[in-house]
UniProtKB/Swiss-Prot annotation:
Organism: Geobacillus kaustophilus
Family of this protein: Belongs to the MetA family.
Any single biological process term in GO: L-methionine biosynthetic process from homoserine via O-succinyl-L-homoserine and cystathionine
Name the UniProt record assigns to this protein: Homoserine O-acetyltransferase
Main location: cytoplasm
Amino acid sequence: MPINIPKDLPAKEILEQENIFVMDEERAYSQDIRPLNIIILNLMPEKEKAETQLLRLLGNSPLQVNVTFLRPATHEPKTTSKHHLEQFYTIFPHIRHRKFDGMIITGAPVEQLPFEEVTYWDELTDIMEWTKTNVTSTLHICWGAQAGLYYHYGIPKYPLPEKCFGVFNHTVEAKNVKLLRGFDDVFRMPHSRHTDVKREDIEKVPDLTILSMSDKAGVCLVASNDGRRIFLTGHPEYDATTLKEEYERDLAKGLPIHIPESYFPNDDPSQPPLNTWRSHANLLFVNWLNYYVYQETPYEWE
């Protein structure tokens, strides 16, 4: 089934060219079924790229999904046009009265700041508190995962000696978990971050279960016991070339950066990288939508 998105959203044409099933609002409203309402708090600097990446994964399930894009009202993005934000995004005061079946909180390029120094931290904590009563399941990605673990459970983040940057192998730590249903014993996922959370901190929290680990990238996937909060430290939504673009950007800025690990063929940046994580990325999102959102959300919110 398709994702339901605004007719003029730039991602629509890209997704249609990739044979992703999308539907504009006029067609969706004529169908007599209950779609899932998913809200995406997009904190990424290149919002249009993040939109396409996430919609690509949300559109690969048998469920119809209505998507609402949310941005912080207390932060003015520098890399997304005001017109785009006004046309396709809303702010928290406009939707806080609503109920949503699922939510995604993306990463953000603020991980080296203390949480409380992020300009929109107070607003983000209001949103995360609101999810406890107004969202069936929330998927937190990268910095969003670190922020969620810190807010909900007091788990700190730690600076890494060098950036965790590349595509890494991960193992399934928890058996018979619906989120990882159909996963191989070992799967790959991109990471791009300067900070980390520690396994021992998470294991001290009875309400949390570590679902997946990586020998090199550390904790990958954590879930609350009721499935209402999922924390993902990697970036399964990334395109094949996203790490390449980040690498070239940092090189151009003169920042200390190493070649993304296990990414370029023969570690040669002149060779085009291959996407080796796409199938598990799609499976992860389908499992989340089906088992943690669709199967758990009420047909009619009270």
